[in-house]
Amino acid sequence: MEKYLSVTTLTKYLKMKFDKDPYLERVYLTGQVSNFRKRPTHQYFSLKDDHAVIQATIWSGIYQKLGFDLEEGMKINVIGRVQVYEPSGSYSIIIEKAEPDGVGALAIQFEQLKKKLTEEGLFQERFKQALPQFSKRIGVVTSRSGAVIRDIITTVSRRFPGVDILLYPTKVQGEGAAEEIARNIARANQRDDLDLLIIGRGGGSIEDLWAFNEEIVVRAIFESRLPVISSVGHETDVTLADFVADRRAATPTAAAELATPVTKLDVLAHLQNQEKRMVTAVRNVLSKKQEALKKCSQSVIFRQPERLYDGYLQRLDQLQLRLKQSLRTRISDNKQLVQARTHQLVQLSPVTKIQRYQDRLGQLDKLLGSQMALVYDAKVAEAKRLSEALLMLDTSRIVARGYAIVKKEESVVDSVESLKKKDQVTLLMRDGQVELEVKDVKTKEI
């Protein structure tokens, strides 16, 4: 009876065969990129030809070292190993190395980085710096032993002796060259005594010149405070450093000429021209001054010099008169001021104040006496009037005149409305009192 395998068992067997097959451990494969969408980490896509498709994976660390970006439809050559993914039973190739098919990877990387930096604006003319007319010290980032530095020194010395050349010895090709170039550009920018920077190397293949296409070098040039001249390779060679630099020179000699736009002979010719212009200007000024002196010597002032100061003498006389008048007015004003101040001092004297206060006190004393007499008389009259009013209210005086006073419970009855039938009342009379009982109450019509 046949034994049936599980799917897992079969898949594990196939995976083992794939893993141990020497032909699948290192596969050289060519195909077209399909279903590619760039991810921030690992890259997953397909490789296909006209009749088949295989899934492909590039781990993040490998992809970052490719030097170019994959694109949909790009044909590439890859080296990798084939493996089986057990959960789905599918197989794929794990890519360890890749390069474009046909066109070199460096050319693609060049165009991709150029496009990226162009979109960022690094190559725009508005960022270009003007080169100085007169540089006292020029920095050069290049190889110590190459012909570049010799050509630059020779050309600068010939065109303008006295300009200092400061070399930053740099590896210009191979591994680590780009980092060293960028580092020396940054070092040069730390100095305050440099006016200009030249970076370059001699000719070579695209691989030899590649360090000057690296992003780290391009950004270092863009961020440079110093103006930068790029002189990389021959006239037909073009690097990204040329695009971002402030000026591009086809040769080291041309770079040195750009760095010294004004030569020693130009300066001498300029000085000679300036000397001629100065001599001409001095002669013209001297001639004009001589002509002016001649005219002055023929003027009335020179023939009759006293007329020069006649007006000033008249002005002096007028000022003297005005000064005397001003002094008289000032003295008169001051006298009046002294008199006014003297009068004020007299008024402010303690003796004067005391006399004034004594006079005022006498007046107030007399006024107080008269006012007190008036108040006293008024109070006496008021007391007499009140006394008479009190006498009029005395009950003994009322009954003495024949009147009687009616009281109810010790209260004086002043109206029949306060009484009612059978109330007990007391009748006060001149010689005694009578106890009565009210028999009837009659109200008098008014």
From Swiss-Prot:
This is Exodeoxyribonuclease 7 large subunit. It catalyses: Exonucleolytic cleavage in either 5'- to 3'- or 3'- to 5'-direction to yield nucleoside 5'-phosphates. Its EC number is 3.1.11.6. Belongs to the XseA family. Keywords: Cytoplasm, Exonuclease, Hydrolase, Nuclease. Heterooligomer composed of large and small subunits. HAMAP family: Exonuc_7_L. It holds the Pfam family tRNA_anti_2. One of its GO terms (biological process) is DNA catabolic process. Coiled coil: none annotated. It is found in: Cytoplasm. It is an enzyme of class 3 (hydrolase). GO terms for molecular function: exodeoxyribonuclease VII activity; nucleic acid binding. The lineage of its organism: Bacteria, Bacillati, Bacillota, Bacilli, Lactobacillales.
